[in-house]
Amino acid sequence: MIELCGLKKSFSGKLALNDINLFIQEGEVFGVIGKSGAGKSTLLRCINILEKPDEGEVVIDGQNLMSLSRKDLALARHKIAMIFQHFNLLNSKTVFDNIALPMRIQGIDEESIKQKIEELLPVVELTDKKDAFPSQLSGGQKQRVAIARALSCSPKVLLCDEATSALDPATTDAILSLLKKINELYGITIVLITHEMDVVKRICQRLSVMVDGKIVETTALSNIFNKPESLARKMLYAQISPELPTCLTRRLADYATEKPLVRLFFQGEEATVPFISQTSRELNMDINILLANIDRFDGVTCGVLVVELTANPLLLEAFINRCEQAGITVEVLGYVLPDGL
């Protein structure tokens, strides 16, 4: 559906995209994640040639957009919609007229416009807001209008540029659920860029990780846990791992004591078995659970524990071996000072 081949883009001599190669399947929800400045937005804008790549090909539905005339490119863009962090609504126009705008620009007759809007308003749950103005809407409602406007010309691709980053958590959940519903209802290919792993894990089937203008990893979410060195997996663990409180970190030493502080990452079946209690009995050691969290990721249960052990170096080594045999990732964070927490 979308194929990017050898894309390069630079600004003032600095590479923003460096040899991007990517294939996105028709009908999937695909995430691109990375820190600010990684090149995510530039990549997204190259897909519809809002930013023209310096090199490479952008092939959508079998058509290379880089080789099209200006007129043909404008026609091809009719099937590529986009929503942004900021809603870009016309404040002087009603919800109806904001949604109608792209269709009127394309010369669609008013009766067809009315029918399309009547179809879309229930989908975005704004049936009672047809005659409202943007100033009368919440942030989430404004984004719903922007989504309906993007869908008005029946696109095959929807590009989402940090579409939830300006919203509160509850509204973000609602918008992500709406995007998932749209994907299932219309079969639209959705490309979503974000810096938040939580957004990706909610609705994406596959993702790419971008670092300094390069795609360093592309994977199905269901495969993340099979790749110990996966950067996406590390980003997931960082998201679900509770932050150590100051009262704990200030009691840590970087030299060995018999109170190692260990972080454990579980996934799949390992997250549902009584590993801690079994290991405590079998190794005859005290295991004090200090912090814990559990989550679901593409149908896989994953969790993190921070535990304080009572263990000499040999016992700590035995504990780590047991964890690794069980498929549990272990990280020694430090050692608790002898006088305790």
Swiss-Prot record:
ATP binds at residues 34-41. It catalyses: L-methionine(out) + ATP + H2O = L-methionine(in) + ADP + phosphate + H(+); D-methionine(out) + ATP + H2O = D-methionine(in) + ADP + phosphate + H(+). Its main location: membrane. It holds the Pfam family ABC_tran. Residues 2-237 form the ABC transporter domain. It is found in: Cell inner membrane. One of its GO terms (molecular function) is ATP binding. It is a peripheral membrane protein. SUPFAM superfamilies: ACT-like, P-loop containing nucleoside triphosphate hydrolases. Its EC number is 7.4.2.11. GO terms for cellular component: plasma membrane. PANTHER family: AMINO ACID IMPORT ATP-BINDING PROTEIN, METHIONINE IMPORT ATP-BINDING PROTEIN METN. The complex is composed of two ATP-binding proteins (MetN), two transmembrane proteins (MetI) and a solute-binding protein (MetQ). Belongs to the ABC transporter superfamily. Methionine importer (TC 3.A.1.24) family. Part of the ABC transporter complex MetNIQ involved in methionine import. Responsible for energy coupling to the transport system. This is Methionine import ATP-binding protein MetN. It comes from Legionella pneumophila (strain Lens). The lineage of its organism: Bacteria, Pseudomonadati, Pseudomonadota, Gammaproteobacteria, Legionellales.
